[in-house]
Amino acid sequence: ADTGDGDFITEGGGVR
């Protein structure tokens, strides 16, 4: 997963 505050790996976000 990428970094960010998205849901799972969608919206360019990562798992937080």
UniProtKB/Swiss-Prot annotation:
GO terms for biological process: adaptive immune response; blood coagulation; innate immune response. Keywords: Adaptive immunity, Blood coagulation, Coiled coil, Disulfide bond, Hemostasis, Immunity, Innate immunity, Secreted. Conversion of fibrinogen to fibrin is triggered by thrombin, which cleaves fibrinopeptides A and B from alpha and beta chains, and thus exposes the N-terminal polymerization sites responsible for the formation of the soft clot. The soft clot is converted into the hard clot by factor XIIIA which catalyzes the epsilon-(gamma-glutamyl)lysine cross-linking between gamma chains (stronger) and between alpha chains (weaker) of different monomers. It comes from the Eukaryota. It is found in: Secreted. GO terms for cellular component: extracellular region. Cleaved by the protease thrombin to yield monomers which, together with fibrinogen beta (FGB) and fibrinogen gamma (FGG), polymerize to form an insoluble fibrin matrix. Fibrin has a major function in hemostasis as one of the primary components of blood clots. In addition, functions during the early stages of wound repair to stabilize the lesion and guide cell migration during re-epithelialization. Was originally thought to be essential for platelet aggregation, based on in vitro studies using anticoagulated blood. Heterohexamer; disulfide linked. Contains 2 sets of 3 non-identical chains (alpha, beta and gamma). The 2 heterotrimers are in head to head conformation with the N-termini in a small central domain. A long coiled coil structure formed by 3 polypeptide chains connects the central nodule to the C-terminal domains (distal nodules). The long C-terminal ends of the alpha chains fold back, contributing a fourth strand to the coiled coil structure. This is Fibrinogen alpha chain.
